[in-house]
């Protein structure tokens, strides 16, 4: 977790990201789901027994940079997250998280929805 905080403190919006490379299939990922709008894949540093990301194929650096016309796309990410959670057997529940900016723990500046499950989640999360 400390490693992710350190990454978030130095990460900045702009430029190509690892997620862009995954979308273009330049680097491998354990893909769970793909359609014309988004991609879901397992996190390389899981924070729960099941931890995957859902990302839009359209580049949006962070939620605060989203436009009104991104509303449907952002909602689609949540629906895909729900469907993937069901497909992965997360019947007892799961958590969906979007990190925003350095204080929010955002380490990659390409909007992404974390879906975590497979254990009891703690509250408060941070």
Swiss-Prot record:
Residues 18-126 form the HIT domain. The modification N-acetylalanine is found at residue 2. AMP binds at residues 43-44, 99, 105-107, 112-114. The modification Phosphoserine is found at residues 45, 72. Its EC number is 3.9.1.-, 3.4.22.-. It catalyses: adenosine 5'-phosphoramidate + H2O = AMP + NH4(+). The modification N6-acetyllysine is found at residues 21, 30. One of its GO terms (cellular component) is cytoplasm. Keywords: Acetylation, Apoptosis, Cytoplasm, Hydrolase, Nucleotide-binding, Nucleus, Phosphoprotein, Protease, Thiol protease, Transcription, Transcription regulation, Ubl conjugation pathway. The active site is at 112 (tele-amp-histidine intermediate). GO terms for molecular function: adenosine 5'-monophosphoramidase activity; deSUMOylase activity; hydrolase activity; nucleotide binding. It is an enzyme of class 3 (hydrolase). Widely expressed. A motif (Histidine triad motif) lies at residues 110-114. It is found in: Cytoplasm; Nucleus. Exhibits adenosine 5'-monophosphoramidase activity, hydrolyzing purine nucleotide phosphoramidates with a single phosphate group such as adenosine 5'monophosphoramidate (AMP-NH2) to yield AMP and NH2. Hydrolyzes adenosine 5'monophosphomorpholidate (AMP-morpholidate) and guanosine 5'monophosphomorpholidate (GMP-morpholidate). Hydrolyzes lysyl-AMP (AMP-N-epsilon-(N-alpha-acetyl lysine methyl ester)) generated by lysine tRNA ligase, as well as Met-AMP, His-AMP and Asp-AMP, lysyl-GMP (GMP-N-epsilon-(N-alpha-acetyl lysine methyl ester)) and AMP-N-alanine methyl ester. Belongs to the HINT family. Homodimer. Interacts with CDK7. Interacts with RUVBL1 and RUVBL2 and is associated with the LEF1/TCF1-CTNNB1 complex and with a KAT5 histone acetyltransferase complex. Identified in a complex with MITF and CTNNB1. Interacts with CDC34 and RBX1, and is part of a SCF (SKP2-CUL1-F-box protein) E3 ubiquitin-protein ligase complex. Interacts with SUMO1, SUMO2 and RGS17. Interacts with the Ten-1 ICD form of TENM1. Interacts with CALM1; interaction increases in the presence of calcium ions. This is Adenosine 5'-monophosphoramidase HINT1. It comes from Bos taurus.
């Amino acid at each position: 977790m400390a490693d992710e905080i350190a990454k978030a403190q130095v990460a900045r919006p702009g430029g190509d990201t690892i997620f862009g490379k995954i979308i273009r299939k330049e680097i491998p990922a354990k893909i769970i789901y793909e359609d014309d709008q988004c991609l879901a894949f397992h996190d390389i540093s899981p924070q729960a027994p099941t931890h995957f990301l859902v990302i839009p194929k359209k580049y949006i650096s962070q939620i605060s940079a989203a436009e009104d016309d991104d509303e449907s796309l952002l909602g689609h990410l949540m629906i895909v997250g729900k469907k993937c959670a069901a497909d992965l057997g997360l019947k007892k529940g799961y958590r969906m998280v979007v990190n925003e900016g350095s204080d929010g723990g955002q380490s990659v500046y390409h909007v992404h929805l974390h879906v975590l499950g497979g254990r009891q989640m703690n509250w408060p999360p941070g």
